[in-house]
């Protein structure tokens, strides 16, 4: 039986050359978790919180999710969940759907209410000035381990924020790692990989 490594391995200090910045970019990708080809997913050989290949089953595709404004996906966060024998993490991904018509309710809202999802979001802090693996912190994956499920969905006709659209909060619990990143050789190569997720897999 393997012994899990629970030690820290690096100095705790901010990077002066590549300081972290808050926030997310305005566009991400959401996938039905059942469409992910887990058998084709590959992790980095030494960094097990880095996925190098995220594949979908043949004929399946992900969908763009765009949230505009100064703070897109506001409220998206990761928090510690203490357990009896092991601590885990809870991921929350928030988004808004600025529409409310029969097609949106049928094709988006009803699905979000009952499905399991994987979401890829792009951090504004990309780590592009790192000496090794520049850009490896740009794309973060949520929902891979347990699936993101609806925690809150609401439609307020007089909301100043959604203007009659939908507020969505998805949550993933019992996550074994603090973060999971998507990175394949470079930032540009990874961005291309993310873009291919919205096209039917071959």
Please name every model-derived segment.
Residues 2-94, 146-161:
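Solvent-exposed edge beta-strands and adjacent loop segments
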Residues 5, 44, 129, 194-196:
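A detector of low-complexity, intrinsically disordered, Ser/Thr/Gly/Pro/Ala-rich segments
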Residues 11, 33, 70, 98-102, ...:
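Generic structural motif
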Residues 28, 95, 119-121, 170:
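Generic structural hydrophobic/aromatic packing signal, biased to beta-strands
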Residues 80-103, 161-177:
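Oligomerization/assembly interface segments of phage tail-like spikes and tubes
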Residues 102-110, 180-181:
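Short, conserved charged micro-motifs
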Residues 106-140:
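Short, acidic/charged, Gly/Pro-enriched secondary-structure junctions
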Residues 141-202:
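Mixed-charge, glycine-accented linear interaction segment located at domain edges/termini
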